[in-house]
A protein has these predicted regions:
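Hinge/beta->alpha junction and helix N-cap segments in small-molecule ligand-binding domains
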Residues: 73-83, 103-113, 164-174, 190-237, ...
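Flexible loop/turn connectors
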Residues: 237-344
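Short acidic capping loops at alpha-helix termini that bridge into adjacent secondary structure
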Residues: 186, 217-221, 271-277
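Alpha-helical recognition/docking segments in bacterial nutrient-uptake
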Residues: 62-177, 181, 240-241, 294-299
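N-terminal helix-turn-helix DNA-binding module of bacterial transcription factors
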Residues: 1-57
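Short beta-strand segments enriched in small/hydrophobic residues
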Residues: 15-19, 57-77, 178, 186-193
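Periplasmic-binding protein-like
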Residues: 69, 123-133, 188-191, 243-256, ...
Length: 344
């Protein structure tokens, strides 16, 4: 059976030139005369590519499929994963000609170090990673390693990594400014006993902002509860036991706020006439705007952050000029307060 080298020898060209011709890459590289001579040699020798060569040619014509690992903590925040996927899909829709696989990699909080795909991505065919929901311990781990694939952090910050985030303390402080501007003097806080960095930053920003604006938050008006509607119900019931109640309640999640609104309604508290309620908005806005009354929130743009992360991944994997000299990309998105009937 004639080989590629036999064809090359008969045509008076190199084996590489014959390979280019067979793979349809002769245009601009091989003269018309040489192409004719190669074709004549192929016919004269009755050359047939080997099965392996045919398979290689077939594979070369298949577009490369990139695989992106999304690391998401396996805890109550899993309910927010749909917003992240919506953002990733929005990014992918901008580049429909580039195929991607997205793999969800759940990990236990504080145990990101167990995810071998970050340090040995070739074992899992990962081309890039998006990392979300990291704890302080997880951040320390990330600070100690140097992944050899593009990595972007979602709502977390390390200077050596690319990230798309918001200023969580600024977000909390903006709500404090709104309270002070409306003339409120005392506030209660319903919050989770949270190990989550972003949640703690938002609450810290809110409390610090209140203090700087002269809005009092008495110690007895700080209620720790579960991050759920049941947690909000319990916090509201404890709040109603106070002899002197603040005029406004801040909740560090809309799940807590929705439970609180229900408990206040059951107790005959008129919102916002008797009490105003504001919250951080984590879930879909359709949830908070359909509460009774509709809830005032400062929305965490989770979908937009996820879209920005995926935009970065696509660029890092497909933009050859960037891939040749990559620098961390740091993006900070703005947040907005949506004032609804729960606050006046």
């Amino acid at each position: 059976m004639p080989t590629l080298k036999d064809v090359a020898a008969l045509a008076g060209v190199s084996a590489a030139t014959v390979s280019l011709y067979l793979n349809g890459k002769a245009a601009g590289r091989i003269s018309s005369q040489k192409q004719k001579e190669i074709e004549e040699a192929l016919q004269q020798l009755s050359y047939q590519p080997t099965p392996a060569a045919r398979e290689l040619k077939r594979l070369k014509n298949i577009p490369r499929v990139y695989t992106v690992a999304v690391y998401w903590a396996a805890d109550p925040r899993s309910a927010l994963l749909s917003k992240v996927m919506t953002g990733i899909q929005a990014s992918l829709a901008k580049k429909p000609d580039i195929p991607f696989n997205v793999v969800i990699c759940p990990y236990q909080p504080n145990e990101l170090y167990k995810q071998k795909g970050l340090i040995e991505p070739h074992l899992y065919n990962y081309d890039a990673s998006i990392i979300a929901n990291t704890s302080m311990m997880d951040m320390e781990y990330l600070d100690s390693i140097k992944p050899n694939i593009p990595v972007v952090l979602l709502n977390r910050r390390l200077e050596q990594y690319s990230y798309v985030s918001i200023n969580n303390q600024k977000m909390g402080a903006a709500l404090a400014d709104m309270i002070a501007d409306r003339g409120f003097k005392r506030v209660a806080v319903f919050r989770t006993q949270s190990p989550y960095l972003a949640v703690n930053d938002r609450v810290t920003g809110f409390i610090s902002g209140c203090r700087s604006k002269g809005v009092d938050m008495p110690n007895h008006a700080l209620f720790y509860t579960d991050n759920s509607t049941d947690g909000g119900i319990q916090a509201a019931r404890d709040f109603l036991k106070l002899e002197e109640r603040p005029d406004v309640v801040f909740c560090d999640s809309d799940a807590i706020a929705l439970g609180a609104l229900y408990a206040f309604y059951q107790a005959g508290v008129r919102i916002p006439k008797d009490l105003s309620v504001i919250s951080i908005g984590l879930h879909h806005s359709s949830t908070s705007k359909c509460s009774i009354p509709p809830l005032t929130v400062s929305e965490v743009p989770l979908t937009q952050m996820a879209e920005g992360c995926m935009d970065y991944v696509i660029r890092a994997l497909t933009d050859k000029s960037y891939a040749a000299d990559p620098e961390p990309v740091h993006v900070e998105l703005e947040t907005k307060i949506i004032v609804r009937e729960s606050f006046q």
